């Protein structure tokens, strides 16, 4: 039993009232069905607004995820592909007892607040429980139960879910039409194939969007490199890495399934219901089905890895360019420092010549010219020597670095 949170502080009453007005507009139907006069005690009107808001949000959250009621929202499809009703709530105990499941099998379905990155496919005595991206379903030889994936952003009332249900109905009906031929695969494999098609089409759409955005950013970086573009590229690289991880997990799941012959044989639910026993290697249909989508997922993984490699290569090139620019700025600063040092030699001679001391150098007619020439010569000599040494450092190559390391190793020995 989930406890309600405490009443929020009184100092935020005006903010809560504004939030309540927005909530009433969004969830007016939910608020109107709740009898506040019987459920809530009479308190301060401002505190009442905050309490009503919290009560409504908690009730809405419990309604979506079935907390406290022990039921799971789902859609039932019979052997002919017809839905028994648009929305059914099944008790957790009924799912476990009637369909031969274990209580831990429903953990992902009940607690799926977010997208499950790790897909799973469990084969039981007379059912297949699959959790693949946004689709969570229980497949039987004559029935399919599709669970609500509200936590992943796709609810039973969404257009994406309705399209998926329509595709599932069409495949399960298995009637030959002008657009679709009759499928010789058994009932459970047709349902499984529909789930794979839906999941992989979502992966493909997401991949196309990510690749298009990344390609545009990389092309823009060829003309100008700005901080905003680099920050945006970093965000896209994170999204690509997350997408690649998701695709790799789907591929790994298919790899594990293809390596387990006993599980592949157990997936023939229709044959098991009819009493037909499959031998260890008699699973050609399901193996070909899984290999087809394994190759498709592998192609998605390869494309995403190629895009990630392109982004990393671009980042390395940008780092090289930025390092080169930084080195040029450092060299410019060193040249200015060498110039100031060489100029200091001339100033030193001039300062000695200008001291208010008796040196009798002023009596010579060539003293000023001599000091000036010596100052210029010292300035040019110091600057040339510094620049020559700087050029030697710039011409240092990898081969010279290896030779230097070899000499140091020989000296140590």
Curated annotation (Swiss-Prot):
BP-aspect Gene Ontology terms: mitochondrial magnesium ion transmembrane transport
Keyword Membrane: yes
Entry's localization field: Mitochondrion inner membrane
Post-translational modification: N-glycosylated. Glycosylation is important for correct localization of the protein.
Sites where a glycan is attached: 202
Entry keyword set: Glycoprotein, Ion transport, Magnesium, Membrane, Mitochondrion, Mitochondrion inner membrane, Transit peptide, Transmembrane, Transmembrane helix, Transport
Transmembrane segments: 329-349, 367-387
Note: Present with 396 molecules/cell in log phase SD medium.
Purpose: Mitochondrial inner membrane magnesium transporter required for mitochondrial magnesium homeostasis. Modulates the conductance of the MRS2 channel. Involved in the splicing of mRNA group II introns in mitochondria by affecting mitochondrial magnesium concentrations, which are critical for group II intron splicing.
Protein name: Mitochondrial inner membrane magnesium transporter MFM1
UniProt source species: Saccharomyces cerevisiae (strain ATCC 204508 / S288c)
């Amino acid at each position: 039993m989930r406890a309600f949170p405490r009443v929020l502080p009184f100092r935020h009453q005006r903010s809560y009232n504004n939030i309540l007005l927005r909530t009433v507009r969004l969830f007016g139907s939910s608020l109107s069905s709740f009898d506040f006069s019987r459920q809530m005690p009479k308190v301060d009107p401002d505190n009442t607004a905050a309490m009503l808001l919290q009560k409504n949000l908690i009730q809405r959250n419990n309604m979506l995820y079935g907390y406290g009621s022990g039921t799971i929202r789902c859609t039932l499809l019979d052997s002919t592909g017809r839905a028994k009703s648009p929305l059914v709530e099944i008790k957790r105990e009924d799912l476990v007892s009637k369909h031969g499941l274990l209580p831990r099998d429903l953990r992902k379905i009940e607690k799926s607040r977010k997208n499950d990155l790790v897909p799973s496919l469990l084969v039981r005595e007379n059912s297949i429980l699959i959790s693949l991206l946004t689709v969570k379903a229980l497949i039987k030889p004559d029935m399919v139960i599709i669970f609500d994936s509200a936590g992943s952003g796709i609810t039973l009332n969404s257009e994406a879910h309705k399209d998926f249900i329509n595709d599932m109905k069409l495949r399960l009906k298995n009637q030959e039409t002008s657009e679709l031929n009759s499928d010789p695969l058994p009932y459970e494999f047709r349902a499984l194939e529909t789930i794979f098609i839906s999941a992989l089409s979502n992966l493909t759409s997401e991949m196309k969007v990510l690749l298009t955005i990344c390609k545009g950013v990389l092309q823009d970086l060829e003309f100008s490199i700005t901080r905003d573009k680099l920050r945006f590229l970093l965000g896209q690289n994170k999204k690509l890495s997350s997408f690649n991880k998701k695709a790799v997990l789907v591929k790994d799941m298919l790899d594990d399934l293809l390596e387990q012959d006993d599980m592949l044989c157990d997936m023939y639910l229709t044959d098991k219901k009819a009493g037909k026993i499959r031998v260890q290697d008699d699973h050609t249909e399901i193996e070909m089905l899984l290999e087809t989508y394994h190759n498709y997922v592998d192609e998605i993984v390869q494309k995403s890895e190629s895009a990630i490699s392109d982004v990393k290569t671009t980042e390395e090139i940008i780092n090289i360019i930025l390092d080169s620019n930084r080195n040029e700025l450092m060299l410019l600063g060193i040249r200015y420092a060498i110039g100031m040092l060489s100029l200091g030699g001339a100033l030193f001679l001039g300062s000695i010549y200008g001291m208010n001391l008796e040196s009798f150098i002023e009596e010579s007619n060539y003293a000023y010219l001599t000091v000036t020439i010596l100052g210029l010569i010292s300035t040019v000599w110091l600057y040339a020597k510094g620049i020559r040494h700087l050029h030697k450092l710039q011409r240092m190559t990898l081969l010279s670095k290896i030779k230097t390391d070899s000499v140091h190793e020989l000296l140590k020995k």
